[in-house]
Amino acid sequence: MHLIDTKPSRIEALGATFNQLQQGLTTIKWLCQLTQLLQHHRGATMAYLSGSQDFLLQIEQLQLSIESARYLITELNNNNYPCIPQDQLNNINNNWKTIAIGWQQDQVMHNFEFHSHLIDSCNKLLRLCMMEQLKPILLHSNSSHQALLEEVFVALPNSIENLAMLRGLSTNVAVIKACGKDSHAKISFLIKETEQQNKNLVQAVNTLSPDSYLVKTYQKPLHKFLLTVKMSILESPEVTADSSLLFTMSTDIIDTQWLAVSQGIQRIEDSAYRALIKA
């Protein structure tokens, strides 16, 4: 009869790896939440700065939620297994404080760029946490997890960010009822990028996660939103788009996309715990 290895060193190592994995996954989930909130804040503040007072209550609520998310991420990172370099976390906190204090005095496109830089930093941290916390465990047990990690932590967030930027720019144009040359070029580019990224995502989902229904559920709303922007902004002699409608349409899609990220993270989490048990 073979006895199970219950040496303290093995059990302690397993416990330490479990705690590190759990903290890493929780940090990743809160980074996703923070990024989603910052994207929403960018779009709402752009609309407000363009002249739509209707977004002020949203902005105030978003800022409270962002503060809570930042606090929780910072507290997590102060525990035994930090996965975010302290200098990078400090940069995110400081950049947000700068935005929170001064956004009402910013020009619309400066506000757009400040937010976009901060969101890019959050997405880079998301990928860093994935590389540090998840990739070693998952790829050690099954190399096929690489494609799933790329889909959840690279492809989907990139696609979401392009659509979130398009939300901000198109809503801004709809509020002011004018589309300058630069805005026209940026919106056209983002539509093409979004269409191509979405095509790639659908193909990846059909291969990797045929049971992942969330990516499939927003296909018709996404096509409708992109067509609305094309027809009422890019191809119309006068901007006829309704700013509130564009913001709501795009936000519903973005929220569903972030739910798809959460669904992917849950699959990865389940696989990581199974791999840990087998280690």
Go through each PLM region and give its residues:
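Hydrophobic alpha-helical segments
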Residues: 1-279
